[in-house]
């Protein structure tokens, strides 16, 4: 789940936006000049010459008016670390790093690459009977510790219900940034949900039906994870993911022999290209990475932001949420937004990237947010903004905050929250939101297949934007992929065989799917469809 801008940041952005000049054509009709036209080129030159002054003014305004709200480090969570003696296993990264082997060329090398000496992995065997979550299925929970940086990432592993000795392993990451992957576990694709009476209800469409799944709370201070420091950009989090998987597969070599897939949604569109590239950068590793999956992700803002207006204004397959006047206003703001993003792409500096995010989110996202409709599903009103429009998150949070649950999982923090707005703010104010992480995707595609899937009722990371960036991505297979046609995606695996669940296009290692009737969280709205395409993808279909 991807946060919309918090109320504070939206207010700040609106204040800054009032200082911005809207690009308009000379005819005064309020239409933005088109790229490639002489009017556009002249206007762009004027804009670029004033950009530095505008950004300086933006930061001055922020410092003056919001100085009490801009600490760039989120507050640490209260915690009590359990002694190592209370854990079933403790894996030392230093022990792994110290192992040398002789290669085929006769030269000595480390058995496993990477800086691991500062990491430990603590493991607890979870008793399913105590929690009632997937009874009979082997489970582990625990923490990855970065002892140098005082970072502690919580994970919960579920073995496959089917054939764990042969089924693949999947890592699941929620987005935000700042949202717990236990949201995905209990609201979307995990082995159980929680009802309003705090009872555990089995999920027949869990992704661990035919795969073992790891749910990871990252970055630090998300969910049950904690730290005395912080992580405020995607690249910094990548090293932790590599360490977690390396130590986990070292402790459980029976899973290391299986195919491994990294998956996630929303802001994981930032995470996964970075994390996959980090794993693939290591030649000697025990991580058998075979593919990456991103659902309703934010990956290439420059290509995706132009699709917010069409999605909100009735061009995405659902009725318009916004009126024509608001839609025109979004059009008028778009060129300035895109110019800011382009400058961010060129510099990758927070000095530029933060104003880009603030202006674009104010001009392009805020009009939708102000309607009271659910930004994660254009078909519904937002029931409760405090719970990100999904009141069931409150029930899940209450269940996870029970002392008996926390004790059974070995949790070391005092409380759980589904999303940490401080983390979201940290990433935003370090410029991470608008950075061009899609540039890593071509190198990933050289080595593994990538699936981009999108529920077609989502606004915040909509299918139009995801289709647009996948079609536009420059990679050796670009031309064939862009020319490929969307074909019907139908169920083949069960009693509903032949039911149309979406559309798919694929070429080379790249696949795009549109899933019908699903919002931001595809497994929540279309559980049967999500398990269908997952199982087929893991079996190697489309790649």
Curated annotation (Swiss-Prot):
Subcellular location(s) of the protein:
Vacuole
Q: What is its main location?
A: other
UniProt propeptide residues: 18-124
The secretion signal range is: 1-17
> Its Gene Ontology molecular function terms?
serine-type carboxypeptidase activity
Q: Which residues does the Swiss-Prot or TrEMBL record annotate as the active site?
A: 266, 458, 520
- Which reaction is catalysed here? Release of a C-terminal amino acid with broad specificity
| Function summary | Vacuolar carboxypeptidase involved in degradation of small peptides. Digests preferentially peptides containing an aliphatic or hydrophobic residue in P1' position, as well as methionine, leucine or phenylalanine in P1 position of ester substrate.
Instruction: Write the protein's name.
Output: Carboxypeptidase Y homolog A
Q: Which organism is it from?
A: Trichophyton tonsurans
From the broadest rank down, the organism's phylogenetic lineage runs:
Eukaryota, Fungi, Dikarya, Ascomycota, Pezizomycotina
């Amino acid at each position: 789940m991807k946060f919309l801008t918090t109320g504070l940041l939206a207010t700040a952005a609106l204040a800054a936006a009032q200082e911005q000049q809207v690009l308009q054509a000379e005819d005064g009709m309020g239409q933005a000049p088109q790229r490639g036209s002489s009017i556009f080129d002249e206007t762009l030159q004027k804009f670029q010459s004033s950009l530095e002054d505008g950004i300086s003014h933006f930061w001055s305004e922020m410092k003056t008016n919001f100085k009490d709200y801009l600490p760039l480090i989120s507050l640490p969570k209260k915690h009590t670390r359990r002694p190592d003696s209370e854990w079933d296993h403790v894996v030392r990264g230093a022990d792994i790093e110290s192992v040398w082997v002789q290669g085929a060329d006769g030269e000595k090398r480390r058995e496993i690459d990477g800086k691991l000496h500062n990491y430990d992995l603590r493991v607890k065997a979870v008793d399913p009977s105590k929690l009632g979550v997937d009874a009979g299925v082997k489970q582990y929970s625990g923490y990855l510790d970065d002892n140098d940086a005082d970072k502690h990432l919580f994970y919960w592993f579920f073995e496959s219900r089917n054939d764990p000795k042969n089924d693949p392993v999947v890592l699941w990451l929620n987005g935000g940034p700042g949202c717990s992957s236990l949201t995905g576990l209990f609201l979307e694709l995990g082995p159980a949900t929680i009802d309003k009476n705090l009872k555990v209800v089995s999920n027949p469409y869990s992704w661990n039906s035919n795969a073992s799944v790891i749910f990871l709370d990252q970055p630090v201070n998300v969910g049950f994870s904690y730290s005395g420091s912080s992580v405020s950009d995607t690249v910094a989090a990548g090293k932790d993911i590599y360490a977690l998987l390396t130590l986990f597969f070292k402790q459980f070599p029976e899973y290391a022999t299986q195919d491994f897939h990294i998956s996630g949604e929303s802001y994981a569109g930032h995470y996964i290209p970075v994390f996959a590239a980090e794993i693939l950068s290591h030649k000697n590793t025990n991580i058998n990475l075979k593919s990456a999956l991103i659902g309703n992700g934010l990956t290439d803002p420059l290509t995706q932001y132009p699709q917010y207006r069409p999605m909100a204004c009735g061009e995405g397959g659902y009725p318009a949420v916004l009126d024509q006047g608001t839609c025109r206003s979004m059009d008028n703001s778009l060129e300035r937004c895109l110019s800011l993003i382009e400058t961010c792409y060129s510099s990758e500096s927070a000095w530029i990237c933060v104003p880009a995010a603030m202006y674009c989110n104010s001009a392009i996202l805020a009009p939708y947010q102000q309607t009271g409709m659910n930004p994660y599903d254009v078909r519904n009103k937002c029931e409760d903004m405090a719970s990100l429009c999904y009141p069931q998150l409150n029930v899940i949070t209450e269940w996870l905050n029970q002392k008996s649950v926390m004790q059974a999982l070995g949790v070391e923090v005092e409380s759980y929250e589904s999303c940490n707005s401080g983390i979201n703010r940290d990433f935003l104010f370090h410029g991470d939101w608008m950075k061009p992480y899609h540039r890593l995707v071509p190198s990933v595609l050289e080595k593994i297949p990538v699936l981009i899937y999108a529920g077609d009722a989502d606004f915040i990371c909509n299918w139009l934007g995801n289709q647009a960036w996948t079609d536009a991505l420059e990679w050796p297979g670009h031309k064939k992929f862009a020319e490929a046609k969307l074909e019907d995606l139908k169920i083949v695996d069960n009693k509903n065989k032949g039911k149309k669940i979406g559309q798919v296009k694929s070429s080379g290692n790249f696949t795009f799917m549109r899933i019908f009737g699903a919002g931001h969280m595809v497994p929540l709205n279309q559980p049967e469809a999500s398990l269908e395409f997952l199982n087929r993808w893991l079996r190697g279909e489309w790649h």
